[in-house]
Amino acid sequence: MEALVYTFLLVSTLGIIFFAIFFREPPKVPTKNTK
């Protein structure tokens, strides 16, 4: 049971960090490079 909780915490933390970086950096690059 504890392993599941720790895994969930790890995944959620990684997801938050990934989303923070993803939404913070590429709003300028893909806007200029539109096909």
From Swiss-Prot:
Keywords attached to this entry: Chloroplast, Membrane, Photosynthesis, Photosystem II, Plastid, Thylakoid, Transmembrane, Transmembrane helix
Keyword Transmembrane: yes
InterPro entries: PSII_PsbT, PSII_PsbT_sf
Transmembrane segments: 3-23
Family annotation (HAMAP family): PSII_PsbT
Subunit structure comment from the entry: PSII is composed of 1 copy each of membrane proteins PsbA, PsbB, PsbC, PsbD, PsbE, PsbF, PsbH, PsbI, PsbJ, PsbK, PsbL, PsbM, PsbT, PsbY, PsbZ, Psb30/Ycf12, at least 3 peripheral proteins of the oxygen-evolving complex and a large number of cofactors. It forms dimeric complexes.
Name assigned to this protein: Photosystem II reaction center protein T
Species assigned in the record: Pisum sativum (Garden pea)
Encoding gene (name): psbT
